[in-house]
Amino acid sequence: MSDPDGGGRTNLTADWDLIPGGPITSPDGHVYFSTGVRGNTHLFRVPVGGGAVEQVTEGDRRLAGFSFSADFSRMAYRATAPTEPGDIYAAPISAATETRLSEVNAALVAQLELFEPENLVFQSPDGTEVEGWMLPARGYDAASGDFPMILVMHGGPHGMYGNDFSFDRQLLAGQGYMVLYTNPRASTGYGEDFRWGTWGGWGFNDYDDVMAGVDHAIDNYRIDTGRMGVTGYSYGGYLTNWVITQTDRFAAAIAGASISNWVSDYAVADIPRTKESEFYGPPWEERGLEHLLRSSPIIHADGVTTPTLFVHGEIDHRVPIEEAEQMYVALHKQGVPAKFVRYPESYHGGWTPWRMVHRTWVQLDWWEQWLKARPAM
């Protein structure tokens, strides 16, 4: 908080270890804001005069789009959960009760078989606690034998998977794949130390975390270790490229909007500051160059064997397409099965619906080709 003239500033969340969203001040003397916490997104509040941060809403779900009545006695928001695509709810400001105002997807959901994820908590090699989820494959409970598994990695890296609805993950589960998704170090929702756990070294602690999740899944589920895939988009695409340079445990990979070379990416992507802050400097400084190179998958591409599909939008300014082209060429020149599908007039955060449909089918075909898991429908 600050005075209208900008003076008298007070940090109301100085002792709070999460990232507050956009603040809204209420007549009752509180500042309301939402934030992500351990895979969920909820509403919080703190007194204007200072005090403890209080969580207002609860549950294993993600809430967004909060709006408030003029007197702040009531609020409305959108809620989504792993088997609920999202609807609008209203509640008193205390959130003691809530009323569902819409059932936009009720008719569609009634026709679908949706799958409930199981929460996982496991330790990385250095003892760090990591959270993840396993979405069981269609027929897993009733069937015997081992199932193929796909490790899905989020973007960011300062993002968060959790208790929201994902069409892509549900589709993979419906096609017979176990779907593992985790929040490795650099994810939000677990405190500042965790959020900056990859600072200066992408591909190290985060890699250890996701692979610890893979080992945990193998120990606790019927996983066919010869039919495992790995995929991600943006930072998740980068981490996919990194994973295939570090291990041959995966039978196939799909790298979406992926980075392979942090030096060539510098100053051509639309967020150059990320490289300087995350890797300790620009490439013309020795320290920055050292960290940029050591975290670049292209530098470690010798010996990669994992068949990999690359998908990328041609006008992606966040992750320019030449980043994926470099990794594709590195694999192709080594005789590794690789395919590149590029989409015109498609940027980082938006594709036309039909291009999204095409990408979905291309990816399913790749998984079927290398993991051979699509069940008879």
What role is predicted for each listed range?
Residues M1-P27, T35-G36, V46-A64, P92-P117:
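Multi-bladed beta-propeller domains
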Residues V31-S34, R74-R78:
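Residue position within the beta-strands of beta-propeller blades
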Residues S26-D28, A70-D71:
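Residue-level detector of Asp-centered blade-edge/turn motifs that repeat once per structural unit
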Residues V37-N40, A81-E84:
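Short glycine/acidic-enriched loop and turn motifs that connect beta-strands
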Residues G8-L12, H42, Q55-V56, R100, ...:
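Conserved beta-strand positions that form and line the central face of beta-propeller blades
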Residues A95-T97, S102-R227, T231-S234, S260, ...:
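Cap/lid segment of the alpha/beta-hydrolase catalytic domain
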Residues Y181-M377:
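Active-site-proximal cap/loop segments of hydrolase catalytic domains
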